[in-house]
């Protein structure tokens, strides 16, 4: 899940990845296949493919799985589905806005699974455009602090188009326009700074703070959505205050 809260974007995301390693592998593999099909099979000339491969490697996806996905997408090897990108919009508990990005070979199945997850967990589907306007597409690069200060990171990426550097506790998050994502990632590499992930993401323009009960309900809905094999990413505008995050940590 991606949202406004430090806790929601770090601890919860890692917990979901740990709990659903197999599903996550499949989703990362799909990203590689689609990136290779769209922009060609050479990571050197296809930044989206490069970043998809890097993300898969950092999540311990075996190299031969990565290479087979790249070959399928590039047409060098038979197989591969006709993946389609679809975005669904909805509202969760407490009026939290939700965007659900799917990558599927069956639109009807994807729509059905998203709808069921929403309705069973206090959410409801919304008309196209009625939620999307609350989010802006941005480039997001995350990296562990590893002794770096915010100024160290800013100095490396400011001239590359970085708009903001957010302190997430154990890590930094660099925000840019999606078109500057490759430049920001390259600037970090040139400065000898390792990063965790670099991808286009939806950032909320307005956030909705929730109490403990609201946070639990929203996260339960996000978990249900992410359980679907067709769902790649879930974005929300939930803001989980620090005191609520501390209570969630204690659960």
UniProtKB/Swiss-Prot annotation:
GO terms for biological process, alphabetical: regulation of DNA-templated transcription
Major site of localization recorded for this protein: cytoplasm
Keyword Transcription annotated: yes
GO cellular component, one term: cytosol
Intracellular or extracellular location(s): Cytoplasm
Keywords: Cytoplasm, DNA-binding, Transcription, Transcription regulation
SUPFAM superfamilies registered for this protein in UniProt: YebC-like
Protein name stated in the entry: Probable transcriptional regulatory protein Mflv_3828
């Amino acid at each position: 899940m991606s949202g406004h809260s430090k806790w929601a974007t770090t601890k919860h995301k890692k917990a979901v990845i740990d709990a659903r390693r197999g599903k996550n592998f499949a989703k990362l593999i799909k990203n590689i296949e689609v990136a290779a099909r769209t922009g060609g099979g050479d990571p050197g000339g296809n930044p989206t493919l490069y970043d998809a491969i890097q993300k898969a490697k950092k999540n311990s996806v075996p190299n031969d799985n990565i290479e087979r996905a790249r070959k399928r997408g590039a047409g060098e090897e038979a197989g591969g589905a006709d993946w389609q990108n679809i975005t669904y919009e909805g509202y969760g508990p407490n009026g939290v806005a939700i965007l659900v990005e799917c990558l599927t070979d069956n639109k009807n199945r994807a729509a059905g699974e998203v709808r069921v997850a929403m309705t069973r967990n206090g959410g409801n589907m919304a008309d196209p455009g009625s939620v999307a306007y609350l989010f802006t597409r941005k480039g997001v690069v995350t990296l562990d602090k590893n002794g770096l200060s915010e100024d160290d990171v800013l100095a490396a990426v400011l001239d590359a188009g970085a708009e903001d550097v957010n302190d997430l506790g154990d890590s930094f998050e660099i925000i840019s326009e999606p078109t500057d994502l490759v430049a920001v990632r390259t600037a970090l590499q040139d400065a000898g700074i390792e990063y965790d992930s670099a991808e286009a993401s939806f950032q909320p323009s307005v956030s909705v703070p929730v109490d403990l009960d609201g946070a639990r309900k929203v996260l339960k809905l996000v978990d249900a959505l992410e359980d679907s094999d067709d769902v790649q990413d879930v974005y929300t505008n939930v803001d989980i205050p620090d005191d609520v995050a501390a209570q969630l940590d204690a659960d």
